[in-house]
Every structure is written in C-alpha cells, then in structure tokens.
C-alpha cells in the first residue's frame, strides 16, 4: 500500500478543495493515486450536493463586476448567513460575477456552462462548493447591462453585499451614477419608467392604496379628524390629455370660486398641477425610479434632478438576496417530530 504523506494530502487538497480528513481518506481508498482520488472526491461531492438539493438556500450574497462596457450583478445563495461570510463563498460569488460579465451568457444554463479560471465549469464549481462548505450553495440569477463609451456605470453594494445594484447614466459622471445606484438600493424601484408598468398591476396597486386610505379614515373618524380623499388615479399611464385638461379646469374653477384675480392664475396653476400629479402617481412613486423622490435631493424626483444636471437614467438592475424565496420556518417541536418520524421509518 502506498504511503500517504502530508505532501500528498496537501496536493490533493489544493486540487480539490477538500478538507484534510476527506483528502486523506480518498488517498487511502485509491492507494495514493492522485487522479483517482480527485475523481473519487468529485463523485462524493456530487453525491453530497444531490442530498442537499431539496434544501432551501435563501441566504447569501450578491456580486457585482464591471468589465469594460459590460456589467454583471449576480445572486448566489447559501443556507445560512454564517456561510455567506465564508471566504470561499465570497470568492465564488465574485468569480461568478466576473466570469458572467466576461462571458455574457444569455441564460442560467449558458452561465453554468462557462469555464472558471480553475478549468471547471460554473456548475461544477457549485457542486464542489456544496461538498466542501457543507451547505447547499446555489447560483440563482444574474443580470447583464451594457453601456456606450459616453455613458457611466454606477456599481454599488449595500448591507454587506446583500443588495447589489448596477445603473447606467448618460451625462454626469461615475460619481453621479453611483449616487443613483445608492438611491435604487434604498428605495427599491422595480422599473425605470411608468411606461413599463402593466395596466392591471396599476389598477390592483391603486385598489390597495385606497383600501389603506379607507382603514386610515376609520381611525380618523374615531378622533373626529376629516376623512382623506380616495385616489382616482395611480400612474401617469392613467393621466390622459383629457384628464389633465379636466384637472386644470377644476383648478381654474376653484380659483374663481375663491375670488382669486385671473391675472395671477398663471402663477398658481403650475404648483397646483404639480400637486395633482404628485397625488395621482403614487404607484409610479413606489415602483418606478424616475418618479421617486431623490434621496440626495428630496425637493426633486430622480428624473427632475437628473434633468437639472443634464443627465439621464438609462437602465438599472437591483438584486436583494432571498427576495421571492419562500423560507422554511420549522419550530423546534416540528424539527424533533420530523427527526423521530425519520428514525422510525428507517
């Protein structure tokens, strides 16, 4: 039987990423054959990964990487926040973002087929990471954004990498683009403009807003406060030319009823129309970047601020770890019951 030296174990660990005991055991089982030991560890890693495949991985990190005029943001998941801080995991996330920005895959299948600097595919890297780290490690999603030479990327990560953002801004500079990305991280817009919102979505969100007003009015009635008006519109998409014209006519009628001189109406109407737009675009303000109040200057929307500095938001992508993933929340009694049931069935 071949002698299993510390040098052999170290070499196998460097090739496979396995722990000391796993590497030594593999060398013993293969009589010191390095190639067979690597293959054995790979097979065991795949088996370990398969056993963990049905686990929920909702923790993790985002990765952001800029490669010339291409930028990538990725989300990689682990089962626990503790593992998400593991150096090997962080390195995998960053390497994933880099290889995707450079490879520009069209979908997850193409992304997983990309070759890492180590020579393994991205898919193999995740199988090996699951085996060596001991938790299910999964590549969830990515977004690619491209720009021209004249445009600027804003790359930003927040909360230790749990949120990753890339934005593209035309005009301004990299610092402005980064500020826009910071706004996106904080305010969570889902699309750039109201033109991207679905009509039924707007209708449903408006109904939710009015339901909240209804509940608020019930509370206000208890303390003799006047009721708040319900919203008729929620988005610019609903504000046709006829609606705008009617709103202006209502304002003029209101000014006339108040006895305001007609010669000063032109100074009053713009402000009241701005208020009308603000009150009737609440859905836009919640979900569209351009309509949100800019966190760096709360006197303006993002669109108005960018206009004031001769800049324009072109595109963005925002990932937050775990969004949309349903986490399992078993209590201690449930875990004990599940363990006992499994033991009885074996």
Swiss-Prot record:
<keyword id="KW-0251">Elongation factor</keyword>
<dbReference type="InterPro" id="IPR009060">
    <property type="entry name" value="UBA-like_sf"/>
</dbReference>
<protein>
    <recommendedName>
        <fullName>Elongation factor Ts</fullName>
    </recommendedName>
</protein>
<comment type="function">
    <text>Associates with the EF-Tu.GDP complex and induces the exchange of GDP to GTP. It remains bound to the aminoacyl-tRNA.EF-Tu.GTP complex up to the GTP hydrolysis stage on the ribosome.</text>
</comment>
<dbReference type="InterPro" id="IPR018101">
    <property type="entry name" value="Transl_elong_Ts_CS"/>
</dbReference>
<feature type="region of interest" description="Involved in Mg(2+) ion dislocation from EF-Tu">
    <location>
        <begin position="80"/>
        <end position="83"/>
    </location>
</feature>
<keyword id="KW-0963">Cytoplasm</keyword>
<dbReference type="GO" id="GO:0003746">
    <property type="term" value="F:translation elongation factor activity"/>
</dbReference>
<dbReference type="GO" id="GO:0005737">
    <property type="term" value="C:cytoplasm"/>
</dbReference>
<comment type="similarity">
    <text>Belongs to the EF-Ts family.</text>
</comment>
<dbReference type="InterPro" id="IPR001816">
    <property type="entry name" value="Transl_elong_EFTs/EF1B"/>
</dbReference>
<dbReference type="Pfam" id="PF00889">
    <property type="entry name" value="EF_TS"/>
</dbReference>
<dbReference type="InterPro" id="IPR036402">
    <property type="entry name" value="EF-Ts_dimer_sf"/>
</dbReference>
<dbReference type="InterPro" id="IPR014039">
    <property type="entry name" value="Transl_elong_EFTs/EF1B_dimer"/>
</dbReference>
<keyword id="KW-0648">Protein biosynthesis</keyword>
């Amino acid at each position: 039987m071949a002698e299993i030296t510390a040098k052999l174990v170290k070499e196998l660990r460097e090739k496979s990423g396995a722990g000391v005991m796993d590497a030594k055991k593999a060398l013993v089982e293969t009589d010191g054959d390095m190639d067979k030991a690597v293959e054995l560890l790979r097979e065991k890693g795949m088996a370990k990964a398969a056993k963990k495949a049905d686990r929920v991985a909702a923790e993790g990190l985002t990765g952001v990487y800029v490669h010339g005029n291409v930028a990538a943001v990725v989300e990689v998941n682990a089962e626990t926040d503790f593992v998400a801080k593991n150096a090997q995991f962080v390195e995998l996330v960053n390497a994933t973002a880099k290889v995707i920005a450079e490879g520009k895959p069209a979908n997850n299948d193409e992304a997983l087929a990309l070759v890492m600097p180590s020579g393994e595919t991205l898919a193999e890297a995740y199988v090996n990471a699951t085996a060596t780290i001991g938790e299910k490690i999964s590549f969830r999603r990515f977004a690619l954004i491209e720009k021209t030479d004249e445009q600027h990327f804003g790359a930003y990560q927040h909360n230790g990498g749990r949120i990753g953002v890339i934005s593209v801004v035309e005009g301004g500079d990299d610092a402005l683009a980064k500020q826009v990305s910071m706004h996106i991280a904080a305010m969570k817009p889902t699309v750039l403009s109201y033109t991207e919102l679905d009509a039924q979505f707007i209708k449903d969100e408006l109904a939710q807003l009015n339901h909240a007003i209804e509940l608020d009015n019930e509370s206000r009635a208890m303390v003799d406060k006047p009721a708040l008006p319900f919203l008729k519109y929620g988005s610019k998409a609903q504000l046709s030319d006829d609606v705008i014209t009617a709103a202006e006519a209502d304002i003029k009628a209101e000014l006339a009823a108040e006895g305001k001189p007609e010669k000063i109406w032109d100074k009053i109407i713009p402000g009241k129309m701005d208020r009308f737009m603000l009150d009737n675009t609440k859905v836009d303000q919640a979900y569209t970047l351009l309509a949100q109040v800019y966190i760096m200057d709360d006197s303006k929307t993002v669109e108005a601020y960018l206009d004031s500095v001769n800049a324009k938001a072109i595109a963005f992508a925002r990932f937050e770890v775990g969004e949309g993933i349903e986490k399992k929340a078993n209590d201690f009694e449930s875990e004990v019951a599940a363990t006992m049931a499994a033991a009885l069935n074996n």
